[in-house]
Amino acid sequence: ADSKMDGPRPCTILAVNPEKVIRAQQDRTLLEQLRTADLLIPDGIGVILAMRLLGLGQAERVPGSELMPKLCGRAVAKGYSVFLFGASAEVNQQAVAALQRRYPGIQIVGSHHGYVKEDEMPSVISLINECQPDLLFVALGSPHQELWMSRYLPQLQVKVCQGVGGTFDVLAGHVRRAPKI
């Protein structure tokens, strides 16, 4: 993430699982978002096995719910600011509180729930830009977050944007992480 902080456009980080690969075969917008993402992280044993079968190396599973906390730790160390967008208002605020407890000194400059009507989106985009976050975490679930990023990222003034699926629910304690296999 450090190398992307001074880039000319936002860096996008997306997790790829078998369900997303299958859906992208029918959804051109999702496929394009996956093709143009700066970093695709393998989130699922099916993707890992496919990569190995295709001779694409010995990748390891990197769930978005594990990468986001690592980026938050880096944000504290480097002074990067963070914005959380998505989930319900309650879960969003609980995720903010959980990150503040886990990472003292984290600069969470704003947050907004993900239940936004289309006509309200310009004000959400304005809010995110006014807060000037370095890192934007989008928790709308897949493929909604990827499609949202495809549509709105060009209007945002963020440096790194990661789709994090249900990670806010995990941080808030509403959902347990899947066990490691």
Q: Which residue stretches match the model-derived regions?
A:
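Short glycine-rich anion-binding loops that position phosphate/pyrophosphate groups of nucleotides
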Residues: 17-21, 140-145, 167
